[in-house]
């Protein structure tokens, strides 16, 4: 038996197929994964993401600590409520994990991945040496992601007037507390939506209200195809500790200025940048029948080979798509080996669908 979120019993009651994910028993789907995917793209759906790790960072040197820990710069946040996407790097420039950090009234809130919890907490604690900072893991919270073009409208109808007002006011990539709830306009689907952190004891009741109001529960299967269509990386597949953010389409998350900010992994990244020899993460589109899968070989004529990191059938585009790490000189055409046969693929920017609209 794996770890269970506060919503486990409710998932079972709703007919979810439960699977192991990073040591957690999580819903894969509640019937039709494809229908759950379409529901999020066209209206909205709700995901249990309570397995994610939430850490509050406070203390007089909290800002300096995070400026050391993260490749992106929390000084960019500017005002309470703003959010920032970043990576934690090791000294070799590899990605320890990717995360979102919010500037709160009392410090910062960091949300990291579930499958990397133990190593992330250990890394954050090790890097805190020498800083006057307090790290508090918030195991008392559950987290629901309500995603889709109508997510905010439907959600605001089910909460208190103060929380509804906050939902209406939030701009993309903002998150603020209202009582003991923390409501953020963030997500992992390429659609508008909310991620709500609330006391674990209140989560089953709120999920019941959402489902009762017609908001469909969605599982890990739909979450994966949605994030792939949006071109959003999955840690452990599209990047890990052996991969530089420069080779994972995450170069935009590295804050090079100010030059004096010596974040972990900076020197390694500077050397990689100067050498200019890092591969790149691209999108692939299979125009023929077949399915692109992780670890399939990508061949670029006259240049070299790469590998698919994430691949699946796209319900929105009705064709197979993938993210792949390929040589930097790769153009707009390549081939992928599927069951011993080579198939032509189109090379595109690593983002296929945003806000329900195809980008390819």
UniProtKB/Swiss-Prot annotation:
Keyword line: Aminotransferase, Transferase
Q: What reaction does this catalyse?
A: N(6)-[(R)-S(8)-aminomethyldihydrolipoyl]-L-lysyl-[protein] + (6S)-5,6,7,8-tetrahydrofolate = N(6)-[(R)-dihydrolipoyl]-L-lysyl-[protein] + (6R)-5,10-methylene-5,6,7,8-tetrahydrofolate + NH4(+)
The processes (GO biological process) annotated in the record are: glycine decarboxylation via glycine cleavage system
Any one GO CC term of this protein is: glycine cleavage complex
The record's InterPro entries line, in alphabetical order, gives:
GCS_T (IPR006223), GCS_T_bac (IPR022903), GCST_C (IPR013977), GCV_T_N (IPR006222), GcvT/YgfZ/DmdA (IPR028896), GcvT/YgfZ_C (IPR029043), TrmE/GcvT_dom1 (IPR027266)
Q: What is its EC number?
A: 2.1.2.10
Pfam families, sorted? GCV_T, GCV_T_C
Gene3D superfamilies, per this entry? Aminomethyltransferase beta-barrel domains (3.30.70.1400), Aminomethyltransferase fragment (4.10.1250.10), Probable tRNA modification gtpase trme, domain 1 (3.30.1360.120)
GO MF terms here are:
aminomethyltransferase activity; transaminase activity
Record function comment: The glycine cleavage system catalyzes the degradation of glycine.
In the record, the note on similarity to other proteins reads: Belongs to the GcvT family.
Q: Which HAMAP family match?
A: GcvT
Q: How does it assemble?
A: The glycine cleavage system is composed of four proteins: P, T, L and H.
What is the recorded name of this protein?
Aminomethyltransferase
Higher taxonomy: Bacteria, Pseudomonadati, Pseudomonadota, Gammaproteobacteria, Pseudomonadales
Q: Which gene encodes it?
A: gcvT
